[in-house]
Amino acid sequence: MTSLPPIVVGVSRFFCFLLFVVGLADGLAAGKPNIVLIMCDDLGWGDVGFNGNKIIRTPHLDAMAKAGLKFNRFYAAAPVCSPTRGSCVTGRHPYRYGIPFANSGHMKPEELTLAELLKKQGYTTGHFGKWHLGTLTKTVKDSNRGGLRGVKHFSPPQANGFDFCFSTESKVPTWDPLLRPKGNNSKKWWDAVSNAGEAKPYGTAYWNERGESVTENTRGDDSRVIMDRAIPFIRGAARREQPFFGIVWFHAPHLPVVAGPRHTAMYAGHPNYAQHYYGCITALDEQVGRLRAELRALGVADDTVLFFCSDNGPEGQADSAPGTAAHLSGRKRSLLEGGIRVPGIVEWPGRVKADRTTDIPCVTSDYLPTILDLIEAKPISDRPIDGMSLVPLLDGKLAKRDRPIGFESKGQLAWIGDRYKLYRKGGAAEFKLFDLVADPSEKNDLAKAQPRLAKRLADQLEAWRASCQVSAAGKDY
């Protein structure tokens, strides 16, 4: 019998190995839904039509809410940006993973992120928009901490499981994101400039997965600039028939808000600040509509789970800023309802029944356990996870949460259950107790009327805080 040359045997074995790897990836990915997490920046609970706003036009988000499940009590894990974002990808409270407030800490390599976990299940992963979980460059002065001043906080998306990214460290203007008009130092808004010669660099860059600064196609509406990168990522995955996990974290309507002429004209009867605030939200809404239309055109809408929320409540004082938390008390940076209760939707035509609303409290930390449950992956068991799977809720089989949600931010504390909320302002000695079902505006303190309930909830909160402190000390790894 004639034997094959060694090189032929080696090549044959190599191709067999490739076939095995490809087959394994296909097997892991078979039947698994695509997943997209959409988040706005500083969008208030009352800033959308589906929560009753009569001024700001959000027809695409309203249609998404009508086509899916709307959360009346969806919470950001923190009243500011970075901590909430980290909760989305870890399922953990910010104090556990070391980003307790905005522009503090970074995503540690020891943390398990959704992108890392989903890659093991055959997903391609992409991040588009605001990152805010670490610096994106070690060499160039960028944004709040980028460059030599923030080397210890270098933790870009590609170091946390993302195959592709088009990301900023932090905020940018919502129109011409890399530019600021010369001579204009406003922190709130300005009119769009038509000529780049009239502008100077804003100071925050977009970076890709190769660590390169990206400047092409960055003029005009920032939400469109972001979606221009997210859609090709989705198209490529759909062509390969590979499940995708995409994060689309818009900058709008974080200050400075700048809308283009078409969108400010929609709100011509309002003050300039409001025109830009409302306009950039409508521009963002159009990009959500564009994404939903693209999923339908690609034939993958029924196989794609779309989550939508905001990272915290609206910026500024209620009597001087255009954003609104509607009837809720408090705003950004507060653990009162208006600071952490945010718009929330999930749409999945293939599984989630349309036109449903839930009053069950849910939180951004629920994303990770929910997604792992949806794809039938093993839950994380080697460290505390604060979120819970919402799959029973998506399927219409959950009557109540039964697992309170804990909050801590700069001295403020809150413990929120299905009905009651325990709250303590930073520096205060006593807790307040609110019945959120009867009193969502938190006007009536029940702590003195129901001391036993307040004590029981306070004990639960302290036990949870003790667990978070163990995690913060690095003992989970």
Where are these regions (language model features)?
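Bacterial N-terminal signal peptides
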Residues: 12-26
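Formylglycine-dependent sulfatase
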Residues: 28-432, 436-466, 470-477
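Bacterial N-terminal signal peptides that target proteins for export
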Residues: 1-16
